[in-house]
């Protein structure tokens, strides 16, 4: 028989007990010798992006069985960043990524699974499973639950598309009535699926397409559309094929580390920059590359950000455009197609579904293909009916958006900007770098000089913003919120949203060693490394200091002389690197363990053991 990993627990006289247990799960004589495929699901009723996944694992499992494999499903945890936002629950979000990676490793290795299908969707689940896939290096296919449909609200005479961030912004804006806020709240998230903009969840699901580990459409077709079911069915069929190619034909080219090479990681980052993806993707790609033992660093991201244009602007960068609009324009394969025509990709890299990325683009890029089935697939539209049920509608747009001059996806000649959607800044406040989502920054503040307002926690900053203590020209500095200092590196969606609601979105900057939600926009600079808790210079900033931000030249500078900075460091080191004011924050043993082993954001906040 083929030398499957699962043979360890299914063959030989000494494995009679293990086989007895396998039989108790439903396996028959004829199943021993087939590849055992782990169906790694993440269903939970806590998260709209995962609430519809309960039956989808068994949908995939049935296809695996029909294709000649043995499917065994298990579940991971899944944290909803939006629900965890703005309170101590957010401390658990980033650490959950590593816990998910570990739990997948534990289950797959403990039971000697041969391959896996990863059913993910939201912010830390796709990255956690991606890290596990790189770590385990067995055949894998990713398939996500898909984006939710954008909300629609009739507001003051006009109908507009909205999402979660709109509800947060209007809630803090006193010009909206309670009734109007309630209407936004009820309309913002109408269906199951990951939040409808180019936030972290959708960004990561798009990047799995560029990495070559998922099927076309994975990042863009809405969760409610019947055509999304095809991805799940195909994933079940494909994983058995990949398992047999590896174990029976000794074809290692289909393993995750053979597919997700440095060239593939650079392709993924190129896509991320071009589509203005979430800054969190930087953390997650660095972490996945670390697991894959690929030398992919902030320097690579910096180099790419200087030459890759912005080809698509989606909410929050362009509030009236959502993932359903990206799909109508050809989805991720269309953006990759434009990047290829601009000679910005390595299309020789393999994928799980085609021999090379070039082959995939020839088949799936709506500009170069003539396949009517592909056209129909990308015409899949929202249903417009609130639901928590997957594949529940089959509506289509009458036409595709193939306009590459003024459409949702542009070609390089007509790019939204020649400068990339993400940028790495360096300076005396961030020696190891920091990240800004330039696609969400107004051109008028690409260069900004302001006076520091320093806060030792996100909570204190929010209180000041809502209390009208922040004025135009301020640079809000939130520190001791990094991976170690938080611990857990909280997202700062509430501070950025509240600055918008106060009319300061284009008049202030926010700098933090924490991170930002994919829903954040504005001059929001995160991942400042080293973080304050590790002795970073952000811990030395004082109220009234001048901070100069120059995105075009990729710099951020604390405008004090070296001698003053050195004196402050000496004083701070004597006191210890901790917040100046005591925080009302309970740090559990689990979070303390995370803080003990995590590294800086510049390294993906991975653990060092």
Curated annotation (Swiss-Prot):
EC number from the UniProt entry: 4.2.1.9
GO cellular component: cytosol
Catalytic activity, reaction form: (2R)-2,3-dihydroxy-3-methylbutanoate = 3-methyl-2-oxobutanoate + H2O; (2R,3R)-2,3-dihydroxy-3-methylpentanoate = (S)-3-methyl-2-oxopentanoate + H2O
Binding, Mg(2+): 81, 123-124, 491
N6-carboxylysine PTM positions: 124
Enzyme class name: lyase
Family: Belongs to the IlvD/Edd family.
Reported function: Functions in the biosynthesis of branched-chain amino acids. Catalyzes the dehydration of (2R,3R)-2,3-dihydroxy-3-methylpentanoate (2,3-dihydroxy-3-methylvalerate) into 2-oxo-3-methylpentanoate (2-oxo-3-methylvalerate) and of (2R)-2,3-dihydroxy-3-methylbutanoate (2,3-dihydroxyisovalerate) into 2-oxo-3-methylbutanoate (2-oxoisovalerate), the penultimate precursor to L-isoleucine and L-valine, respectively.
Protein name: Dihydroxy-acid dehydratase
Organism: Acinetobacter baumannii (strain SDF)
């Amino acid at each position: 028989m083929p030398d499957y990993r699962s043979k360890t627990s299914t063959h030989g006289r000494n494995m009679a007990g293990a086989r007895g247990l396998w039989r108790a799960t439903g396996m028959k004589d004829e199943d021993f010798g087939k590849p055992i495929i782990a169906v790694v699901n993440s269903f939970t009723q806590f998260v709209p992006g995962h609430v519809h996944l309960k039956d989808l694992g068994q949908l995939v499992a049935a296809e695996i069985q029909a294709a000649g494999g043995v499917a065994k499903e298990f579940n991971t945890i899944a944290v909803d960043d939006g629900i965890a936002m703005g309170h101590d629950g957010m401390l658990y979000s980033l650490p959950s990524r590593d816990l998910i990676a570990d739990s997948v490793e534990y289950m797959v290795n403990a039971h000697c699974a041969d391959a896996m299908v990863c059913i993910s969707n939201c912010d830390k689940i796709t990255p956690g499973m991606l890290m596990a896939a790189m770590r385990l290096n067995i055949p894998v296919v990713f398939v996500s639950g898909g984006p939710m449909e954008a909300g629609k609200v009739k507001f003051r005479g006009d109908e507009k598309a909205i999402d979660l961030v709109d509800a947060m912004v209007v809630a803090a804006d006193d010009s909206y009535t309670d009734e109007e806020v309630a209407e936004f709240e009820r309309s913002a998230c109408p269906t199951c699926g990951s939040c409808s903009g180019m936030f972290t969840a959708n960004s990561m699901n798009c990047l799995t397409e560029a990495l070559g580990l998922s099927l076309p459409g994975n990042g863009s077709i809405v969760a409610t559309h019947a055509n999304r079911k095809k991805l799940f069915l195909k994933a079940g069929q494909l994983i058995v094929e990949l398992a047999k190619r590896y174990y029976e034909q000794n074809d290692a080219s289909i393993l995750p580390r053979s597919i997700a090479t440095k060239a593939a990681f650079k392709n993924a980052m190129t896509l991320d920059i071009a589509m203005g993806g979430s800054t969190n993707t930087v953390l997650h790609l660095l972490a996945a590359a670390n697991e894959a033992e690929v030398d992919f660093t902030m320097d690579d991201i910096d180099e790419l950000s200087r030459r890759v244009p912005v080809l698509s602007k989606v909410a929050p960068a362009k509030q009236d455009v959502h993932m359903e609009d990206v799909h109508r324009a050809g989805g991720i394969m269309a953006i990759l197609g434009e990047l290829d025509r601009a000679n910005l990709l390595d299309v020789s890299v393999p994928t799980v579904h085609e021999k090379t990325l070039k082959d995939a683009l020839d088949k799936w890029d709506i500009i170069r293909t003539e396949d009517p089935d592909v056209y129909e697939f990308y015409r899949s539209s929202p249903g417009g009916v609130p639901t928590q049920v997957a594949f529940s509608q089959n509506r289509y747009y009458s036409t595709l958006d193939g306009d590459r001059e003024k459409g949702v996806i542009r070609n390089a000649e007509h790019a939204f900007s020649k400068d990339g959607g993400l940028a790495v800044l360096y300076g005396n406040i961030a020696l190891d770098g920091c990240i800004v989502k330039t696609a969400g920054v107004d051109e008028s503040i690409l260069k900004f000089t302001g006076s520091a307002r320093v806060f030792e926690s996100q909570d204190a900053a929010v209180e000041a913003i809502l209390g009208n203590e922040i004025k135009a020209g301020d640079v809000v500095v939130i520190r001791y919120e990094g991976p170690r200092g938080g611990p857990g590196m909280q997202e700062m969606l509430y501070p950025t949203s509240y600055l918008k609601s106060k009319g300061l979105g284009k008049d202030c900057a926010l700098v933090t060693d924490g991170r930002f939600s994919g829903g954040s926009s504005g001059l929001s600079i995160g991942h400042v490394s080293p973080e304050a808790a590790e002795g970073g210079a952000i811990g030395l900033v004082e109220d009234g200091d001048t901070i100069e931000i120059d995105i075009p030249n990729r710099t951020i500078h604390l405008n004090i002389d070296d001698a003053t900075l050195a004196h402050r460091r000496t004083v701070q080191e004597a006191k210890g690197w901790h917040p100046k004011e005591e925080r009302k924050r309970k740090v559990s043993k689990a979070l303390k363990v995370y803080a003990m082993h995590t590294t800086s954001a510049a390294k993906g906040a991975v653990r060092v053991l």
